[in-house]
Amino acid sequence: MKGDCYYYRAVIVSLVEDGDLRLENNVPDPLIGQLAVGQEGFVPLHSILMPLVSMPFYLLFRTQGLLLFNILDCMILIVLIFKLNGLFFSHVIAFSTTILYATGTLLLDYTYNYSPDVFSTVLLLAGLYLVLRGKYYWGAIPLGLSIFAKIPNVPLVVVILLYAVFIIWKGDGTNRSIKDDFRKKFTITSITAFIFIVANTPFAYSNYLFFGSPFVTGYQRMAVAGVDGQAVIVDHVNMFNEPLLKGIYQVLFDIGNGILLTNPVLILAFAGIFWIKKVKAQDQMYLILVIGLIQFIMIAKYDAWSTSHFSNRFLMAFIVLSSVFTSNFFSYLSHRYSLEDSIPEQIM
């Protein structure tokens, strides 16, 4: 297991062997920035959602079970890439892009892992896909859980939900009375918001148990060793100090972690952006572009942007979302050279 994976597994080990979530006896050194200072000792810095979901795999097959869980997670992510691209393009193009991303991006390397980034990207992509299909109630569940899985998903989820609210209140063009129309839109919006809040309740409750507040996370209480060897608390909020232009260059072109060098398919995605206006569902394409850029800018500013064993796992959602622009480039080529590519009916 590479990187943070060891500490996600430590959560399961502590629950199974000790019956608690105090991890100082389950890791070699509690003061290397992988645990948090809780009310009653050192507790998980990272989300406990993936360990809880994958615990049955550990109970059945131990560590190998977690690797199996990750493989299944990657398979779900690949299916979601296909489904998302299928909203805009023919199955042939969607399938071609999916295979390209499954084999020619960082996803291939992170398949043999126990990756929280794959897990959180699955939840984010599932929620986005359901919202784009107009299934707001169902979409609110994985979107809420994606925040529990990875706190940096917050701004991405907020933008997706704002888009959902905009579409709900934009209306369907029917001739219902203004009163009935308002009532329906208000009901849909309220139920969606309620489901989203409920989906975030486990996250808030775990924060309350660990840190005494539903709004304080492990990333605000990271434990590191001070000069005297005592625990010092570091807040991740204060770790976004990279100059933007420098950060963009590093994130793109760094030898080991630059996403352009390790995911060259992004060149095709960049080209596909210029033909967004060829797609009927332009608003959805621009939504995907915006949430991808938000994540990109966040990580470009992040001091620890290079702490991935290969490519940049923090930008996994950005890379996966770029697939629709790669498909758009393929669609442009197919039309340019008179190859058949029919647009799915649901976006006509």
Q: Model-predicted segments: where are they?
A:
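Transmembrane-helix motifs of polytopic, lipid-linked glycan transferases
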Residues: 65-89, 121-122, 126, 274
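Transmembrane alpha-helix segments characteristic
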Residues: 101, 164, 197, 279-302
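Short acidic/glycine- and proline-prone juxtamembrane loop motifs at membrane-interface regions
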Residues: 109-119, 209, 258, 311
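Membrane-lumen/periplasm interface segments of specific transmembrane helices
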Residues: 159, 187-272, 288, 292-299
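Membrane-interface helix-loop-helix junctions at transmembrane boundaries of multi-pass membrane enzymes
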Residues: 171-191, 271-290, 339-341
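Hydrophobic, aromatic-rich transmembrane alpha-helices
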Residues: 260-282, 289, 323-329, 334
